[in-house]
Amino acid sequence: MMQGYFKNHTNPTVVFDAFFRKNPFDSSYSIAAGLEQAIEYIKDLHFSQEDVDYLRSTRLFDEDFLEYLLNFRFSGDIYAIPEGTVVFPREPLVKVIAPIMEAQLVETALLNIVNHQSLIATKASRVVYAAGGDGIMEFGLRRAQGPDAGLYGARAAMIGGCIGTSCVLTGQMFNVPVKGTHAHSWIMSFPDEYTAFKKYAELYPDACILLVDTYDTLGSGVPNAIRVFKEMREAGIKSNFYGIRLDSGDLAYLSKKARKMLDDAGFTDAVISASSDLDEYLISSLKNQGAAITSWGVGTNLITAKDCPAFGGVYKLAAVQDEKTGEFIPKIKLSENSEKITNPGNKTVFRLYDRENGKIKADLIAFADEHFDENKDLMIFDPVHTWKKTLLKGGTYTVREIMVPVFLKGECVYETPAVMDIQAYCKKELNTLWDESRRFENPQEIHVDLSDRLYDVKKELLNNYHRR
């Protein structure tokens, strides 16, 4: 398409919105993530001589267009919702304002990055919520769909609330805690289980989590772990973090039995960690069964988002700038499916909170130049079923614009926070959700509505089309 615009001398400034239509996992919310990597992509976006030589070899591109690519740099504006923010369907996560050749080029990369990390961050937030304050460790690198999915998926999982990751490279690159234990192969490589435990404890007395299910969890694994813990205590070694890990079997039953054995031996502060194909539903079930587990290693189902392996982000044209007046002319994509009809214009997103408790009442999509007085009544409209409207009385709500400038005239103006700072922000964001919106079964939906003015423009565009 870029060459098509180039050869037709058509390169107007346009507005594109990146958004999604449905939350994953039947959730009521999603978590925005991936902005840092999107920024890095835009900053480094260029075509090398090697790139151009390859494109030339395809025999699809003319020389004048290839020459243009050699000097290509992104020159537009980008606005986005910061990472860690709770977000909802149909509202723009990223808005690109740029010449159409530039705006069109960045589509695939932006969606790839934001879709993936938003998916994993959302899944992680659900798993963390299910654990009810217990620590969740991200253990999925070996099951991720490739190295990058493991690396950046672990980053997203940290944003969603995990206390650490087994991916050492993620720890190095993003300064997040690295956590892990030994494998069954460690046990099997020694003459016996006790020796394996003893050698591991000698190496890592302050991170001594022993995997007890290689042979017989209750018959040998837990007893041998207790033996090693006693020897550590007798030697005057006080561990800051020690315990056992269960990776198979009936985790509820085994954890309760193991807890009693540890407590009877005087190790009431020993941790019981569990892994084994965990997700938010199994963790919830185990906690409801009274499982004596306080630390969870979650791998495959988290890093692959197994029950919803794709985040349905899309990228749609919303406005074209009039070259004479400089005004943005709203554009709309129609569909027989009402949910796929886009919202036109150069827009932003406002979050409306209940003034009394700080919980989210609704999100409001509005034109970028709109402003709202919290002390005045506000009428908002459903973007799909536009005959549905809600009146918010002045003084009962507060307003916060949640989109921020990231690039202006091709220059990055946004300072990316550290991942652990994003995680802390995400935790605060999740606390603005109503309890009813966080349950896993039939959660209460948070409404995303249109401003009065945007509603009128959308209605006019729809009416104009139907009059043709």
Where is each model-derived feature located?
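Gly/Ser/Thr/Ala-enriched C-terminal appendages of enzymes
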Residues: 1-12, 25-27, 265, 278-468
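Buried, small/hydrophobic-residue-enriched core segments of structured protein domains
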Residues: 1-13, 22-24, 60, 66-75, ...
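An N-terminal, globular interaction/scaffold subdomain
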Residues: 40-44, 80-83, 87
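Short coil/turn segments at secondary-structure boundaries
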Residues: 53-54, 122-126, 140, 438-445
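Hydrophobic residues within beta-strands of alpha/beta enzymes
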Residues: 179, 244, 272, 294-296
